[in-house]
Regions:
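SDR active-site strand-loop-helix element
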Residues: 6, 32, 69-70, 106-112, ...
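Oxidoreductase cofactor-interface core, primarily capturing Rossmann-like NAD(P)-dependent enzymes
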Residues: 22, 27, 116-213
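Short, polar loop motifs at secondary-structure junctions
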Residues: 30-38
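Conserved Rossmann-fold NAD(P)-dependent oxidoreductase catalytic core, especially the SDR/UDP-sugar
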Residues: 80, 85-130, 135, 142-144
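NAD(P)H-binding glycine-rich loop region in Rossmannoid oxidoreductase-like domains
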Residues: 4, 38, 44-93, 97-100
């Protein structure tokens, strides 16, 4: 299988790259990034691109599956508009190009409670992206909605707080369906869904079931 990764420098993306490198069924890994992550492996081809200039890289989008796990915060992006551009526009445009290039499968990391009709900016944006991706002519589309993530060496204080709160409630028997999830569990689930060509929307309980095998 020839894999394409969008978001290889993020927490899930880093685990995904390693998962694919260690998998003997994966022949090639093409990553599309804005900066060089310094990955030195014979399977990996790094494309350093400007996502606003797709005419320069669109023909390089060749493979069997796209793994899309781009994600940022409003603080990191600098504004709502920039966050939308990174989280929605870049991912949708890449997916559209992949479909045009004949890539048959697309695996998207969305977010828990994503809903295009949500009154909240983040979950609405993620829901809108899901709906847009579903309209593209892929043979298989897998959408993952992970809960709060446990990232290695995270510096996001809000994320640390949300994980701590969820872990507290989990300890007293509440919100079990939203217990925090390690990024490597998400990465493993993504690979398994690509291999089995399972389409659908996968909620936290589904991701745990598949990703912890």
């Amino acid at each position: 299988m020839r894999a394409i990764i969008l978001g290889a420098t993020g927490a899930i993306g880093k685990d995904l790259v390693q998962e694919l490198i260690n998998d003997d069924t994966i022949e090639q890994i093409a990553i599309f990034v804005r900066r060089d992550p310094g990955i030195n492996n014979e399977k990996v081809t790094t494309h350093i691109v400007d996502f606003d200039q797709s005419d320069k890289w669109r023909l390089s989008v060749q493979g069997d599956v796209v793994f899309s796990c781009i994600g940022t915060t409003r603080k990191a992006a600098g504004s709502k508009d920039n966050q939308y551009k990174i989280d929605y526009t870049y991912q949708y445009n890449f997916a559209k190009i992949a479909a045009e290039q004949g890539v048959p499968s697309f695996v998207l990391v969305s977010a828990a409670m994503a809903n295009a009709n949500s009154p909240f900016f983040y979950t609405k944006m993620k829901g809108e992206l899901e709906e847009a991706i579903k309209q593209l002519p892929f043979q298989h589309i897998s959408i993952l909605r992970p809960p709060a993530l446990i990232r290695k060496n995270t510096t996001r204080n809000s994320e640390k707080l949300s994980v701590s709160i969820l872990q507290f409630f989990n300890q007293i028997g509440l919100l079990k369906s939203q217990r925090p999830m390690k990024t490597e569990v998400v990465a493993h689930c993504m690979v398994e869904l690509a291999k089995t060509k399972k389409s659908g929307v996968f909620e936290p309980k589904d991701i745990f079931k598949i990703g912890e095998r």
